[in-house]
């Protein structure tokens, strides 16, 4: 396995670790509605950071975006909005299925759809079937799916042992939302594929290869922001017991603390895709769609490890922890299989 591929896998791991940790600051926010908290974090992660970093990277910010016609930008934006819909459905999936089953089904579907639909759309799926490296990477995808399933099972055992139940368990509604979440969340993978002309244009301007994907985030995350912020603002305006005015009428120190914690959560959320771009840049071009598989499987891996570090499994018993450990090992094996496949 080449150093470039190894570093690509490593950066995807770092990005996934940030994704697994990003909600920790949000949990410390007090006396704010979820909608206000999510909006403040989202403004940082989907608007302020992408625009600021792109402005720092590009020699002429407006000229760069002005060179693309609508036929290039619109698919990137719409796939970003598609991914934003997946974000909203993610929370509802947890509500009706519980954390473990919800995460397992949603992540499993988005891993498969986001990874395999891209080569199918591009007409490159035969590379996966008819080449040794392609078959090995395809094997890695399915091994990762098995790993996700094992971690999901560990979570179910933990929830059963600790008496944790879904907020409003509804299997039919939850499964429908999980499938929708999995499909729509793959929009980020499709957006990255659609944004290749933007990456190439950034490279032509002399932007470092590690950073060429970052300017496209202005458009991708703009689509996600439209959906997420629109959803939050509508709820804040329509739902009787929600009020942004009340949220900002708290004691000044608490408001400042909530803003800083929400902003930190937004920063950590953004960093997952900052390092995703670094990892994506190191993956061989013919296998660039494998970035999504690496990110999502590492997200599950890191989520389990973070849970252990935060002692969320302390009272779960030995069996759930053993099953979790097995799932994490399987995901690590899957990443190595994919890496070897890309190198062959």
Curated annotation (Swiss-Prot):
GO terms for molecular function: rhamnose transmembrane transporter activity; symporter activity. The chain crosses the membrane at residues 4-24, 38-58, 68-88, 101-121, 137-157, 175-195, 214-234, 259-279, 290-310, 321-341. Its main location: membrane. It comes from the Bacteria. The keyword ATP-binding does not apply. It is a multi-pass membrane protein. GO terms for cellular component: plasma membrane. It catalyses: L-rhamnopyranose(in) + H(+)(in) = L-rhamnopyranose(out) + H(+)(out). Keywords: Cell inner membrane, Cell membrane, Membrane, Sugar transport, Symport, Transmembrane, Transmembrane helix, Transport. Pfam families: RhaT (PF06379). It is found in: Cell inner membrane. NCBIfam families: PRK13499.1-1, PRK13499.1-3, RhaT. Uptake of L-rhamnose across the cytoplasmic membrane with the concomitant transport of protons into the cell (symport system). Belongs to the L-rhamnose transporter (TC 2.A.7.6) family. This is L-rhamnose-proton symporter. It comes from Salmonella typhimurium (strain LT2 / SGSC1412 / ATCC 700720).
